[in-house]
């Protein structure tokens, strides 16, 4: 019971943070003094933050419905999913003056997954990584072959991932976790990614580096042949 309460507290805190930022931005808008460009920039920030918060709420709803078996598995283009994530997050990267490099090295493009769940996993990895990139050390989204699996990895340059969190990710997160050494990191996002990975029979893992962490998901490759038209 205590663990459930703790998990709910972490989830509530993460969902409260964007609301607080949105309130601050809204209060800072001065329609009499601000230029049109400044007002448009603030509006765009509000839209970006609200979209990310809504996505987390939607993802939590999906987590609660996983046991209903409503999310079908099918051959999915992992490159298409990654491109979709990059397109949706581009305004968020730009507003933070950050960039995410994409490197697609896999020969296999089709995986067996649910497209919505896979999108959410990669999306959460990328939103975590943007906090730990600079123009000199930009984060990297990569796709590579890994035996009968296809691996999607997001490399960041943040503080070392605590051993306890690394072990929890390895064993499968059972509740949202607070990543105190990585204040920009979303424990709720990692929890969602862990749940979705398990549902799709994919493997979620984290690799610690001296100067950051790579969050990865390995998805079963599809034997179906992809045709280009």
What are the residue ranges of the model-derived segments?
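Conserved C-terminal segment of the DHp
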Residues: 21-36, 66
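Short alpha-helical segment of the dimerization/phosphotransfer core of two-component systems
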Residues: 45-53
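Conserved micro-motifs of the catalytic ATP-binding
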Residues: 67-72, 110-113
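Short conserved segments within the C-terminal catalytic ATPase subdomain
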Residues: 92-102
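Short conserved segment of the HATPase_c
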Residues: 161-175
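Conserved glycine-rich
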Residues: 201-202
